Amino acid sequence: MVGKMWPVLWTLCAVRVTVDAISVETPQDVLRASQGKSVTLPCTYHTSTSSREGLIQWDKLLLTHTERVVIWPFSNKNYIHGELYKNRVSISNNAEQSDASITIDQLTMADNGTYECSVSLMSDLEGNTKSRVRLLVLVPPSKPECGIEGETIIGNNIQLTCQSKEGSPTPQYSWKRYNILNQEQPLAQPASGQPVSLKNISTDTSGYYICTSSNEEGTQFCNITVAVRSPSMNVALYVGIAVGVVAALIIIGIIIYCCCCRGKDDNTEDKEDARPNREAYEEPPEQLRELSREREEEDDYRQEEQRSTGRESPDHLDQ
């Protein structure tokens, strides 16, 4: 009798586990949203328990580590944001009714990646508690930068490069070529993102090359003018540069020499100004002799006047 009951007991246990086991799902594998906009990452959970003691957690999965997006406890409903998601992430208003979705605002290219939704309930720890969704932020290509690698001299090999620093999905690149008469010319297309290789170039290689960078969000362009020259022109260019450098050095030398001479003249003038000006207070000998005679005459006059005064004094007393 007991042996016959074992299958029934196992069935009841299996049913109980199935009923209590939590199930977390993300209905979409990939979501697309434009840069600067908002996106809702959907996530739902199913459980037979009515208790909501636990939390909802979202993380971004990186190659080397996990980056926290947000933790939302059922008990106090207080957000615990990751550093890069403060004031940008909010949980669904129906979080307690099986909706664990989040909304991310102000999307940037850095938000590209895979996100994991996790629901943990203390009363239902069995089952599938996690699910993932990939977010692709759509960004139009930035204006590409065009460049030439190598010297545009007849017989050389050169490469034309084109690269947008931003763009999601990754921009696709294409090239067009026009001669100096603005007529489109054939051009072998490289693999997208690879440079255009031009080998053994000649004057026929000269012209305008236009690169187009595009994805589903937009298109941008850049262009290069290729002017192929002969080696003799290259030598003339170097000679011209050398002459210019020598001339500049000569001019600089002249300026330095003039400044030094001017400095010496200024020092000489300062020294002369510092010497006492003897002419200002030395009188010529003739003037000194004249002054001496005038002083002698003045002294004689005073002595004579004193003698005269002495003779007249008795008469004045008698009167």
Curated annotation (Swiss-Prot):
Q: Name one Pfam family in it.
A: V-set
| Residue intervals on the Cytoplasmic side | 257-319
Residue ranges annotated as compositionally biased, kind Basic and acidic residues, are: 267-295, 303-319
Q: Which SMART domains match?
A: IG, IGc2, IGv
Glycosylated where? 112, 200, 223
Q: Which residues lie on this side of the membrane: Extracellular?
A: 22-235
Give a yes or no for keyword Cell membrane in this entry.
Answer: no
Where are the residues of the annotated region Disordered?
267-319
May I ask which residue range the UniProt record assigns to the signal sequence? 1-21
Per UniProt, what is the membrane topology? Answer: Single-pass type I membrane protein
State the PROSITE patterns in the record: IG_LIKE (PS50835)
**What keywords would UniProt list here?**
Disulfide bond, Glycoprotein, Immunoglobulin domain, Lipoprotein, Membrane, Palmitate, Signal, Transmembrane, Transmembrane helix
- Function (record text): May play a role in cell-cell recognition and signaling.
Q: What is this protein called?
A: Cell surface A33 antigen
Name its species: Homo sapiens
Q: Which gene encodes it?
A: GPA33
